[in-house]
Amino acid sequence: MIKISIDAMGGDFGPEVVIPGAAKAFERHPDIRFIFFGLPAQVEPVLARYPKLKEASEFRASEVAIGMDDKPSQALRAGRGKSSMWQAIEAVKTGDADACVSAGNTGALMAMSKFCLRMMSDVERPAIAGIWPTLRGESIVLDIGATIGADARQLVDYAVMGAGMARALFEVRKPTVGLLNVGTEEVKGLDEIKEAGQILRDTPLDGLEYSGFVEGNDIGKGTVDVVVTEGFTGNIALKTAEGTARQMAELLRQAMSRTLLAKIGYVFAKGAFDRLREKMDPNKVNGGVFLGLSGIVIKSHGGANAEGFCSAVEVGYDMVRNRLLEKIEADLAHFHHSHSHVSSKA
């Protein structure tokens, strides 16, 4: 049995999307047990529509719901100990839940997670890791918005954590890792990126294969299993990709409805277009993982639909089932030991 705490008030639509999304996840994974946190007047009527889910879940009342526009400091002051977001995170800290899922305010969720859950040993900054659809399947990109900027040491930690996530999710023994840069040549890029690349080249690691620098167009190609960058660049890349996917879907729709011949052609090609639309749908790869914390916290898109929220829950489920935290902590300990050994020889 895997226990997942849910911030039922999170996201643009709150319980009206969160609970149906959880119900979908429960249908697919009957061994999940949910703890919902939220305002009773809004959560209980929706939960009552799903009797099987309600029977296998627990509801705990909250006093406060964190707004999508609340500043992190404001959210901490107003919501510590009594908001649905805080209580869902705290359930992981106390051991009541194995993972937390929220579609709420990203800044508030990160601030509360860092405040409530301790950081992993030797990790200075957390990162948000996202699953990215590619021509070869899927890859992991981090950081996609936890913090702005990162030094070489932090980028290397992201690489180790991202590789651990790739092994847990994709069952790849030795994931390939690339540092996002403006070119693939070793002389290009910011000093911190070049230094991180040097560290990854010089340190022997069993858990990842460093493939050098990658460019923006390599993300969608699936050139590597894990793409590492800092949060400012990563978030821009994410939003650009999501916008491009929606633009392409709309352009296809317009092209297929422009003439009678195009409409007839669409009838015959509908299956292929449906598969393409599904592949490009951001809801299908929803769920950013907060890496570097001592507990599992999953961030769903605020505007996700029920299927999208279900995807975020399934990411949390897979993280717990594959013992992500234990693997990443072991990888980080091995890396820091290996790097200190290499540095002492230099």
From Swiss-Prot:
Keywords tagged on the record: Cytoplasm, Lipid biosynthesis, Lipid metabolism, Phospholipid biosynthesis, Phospholipid metabolism, Transferase
EC numbers for this chain: 2.3.1.274
Keyword Membrane assigned to the entry: answer is: no
- Its main subcellular localisation, reduced to a broad class, is cytoplasm
Which pairs of Cys residues are joined through disulfide bonds in the record?
A: none
Q: Which reaction does it catalyse?
A: a fatty acyl-[ACP] + phosphate = an acyl phosphate + holo-[ACP]
Q: Identify the GO cellular component terms for this protein.
A: cytoplasm
One GO molecular function term?
Answer: phosphate:acyl-[acyl carrier protein] acyltransferase activity
In terms of Pfam families, this protein maps to:
FA_synthesis
Q: Where in the cell is it found?
A: Cytoplasm
Instruction: List, in alphabetical order, the GO biological process terms annotated in this UniProt record.
Output: fatty acid biosynthetic process; phospholipid biosynthetic process
Keyword Manganese assigned: no
Give the record's pathway.
Answer: Lipid metabolism; phospholipid metabolism
The protein's job, in short, is: Catalyzes the reversible formation of acyl-phosphate (acyl-PO(4)) from acyl-[acyl-carrier-protein] (acyl-ACP). This enzyme utilizes acyl-ACP as fatty acyl donor, but not acyl-CoA.
Q: Which family does it belong to?
A: Belongs to the PlsX family.
Subunit composition? Homodimer. Probably interacts with PlsY.
Tell me what this protein is called: Phosphate acyltransferase
Organism listed in the record: Brucella canis (strain ATCC 23365 / NCTC 10854 / RM-666)
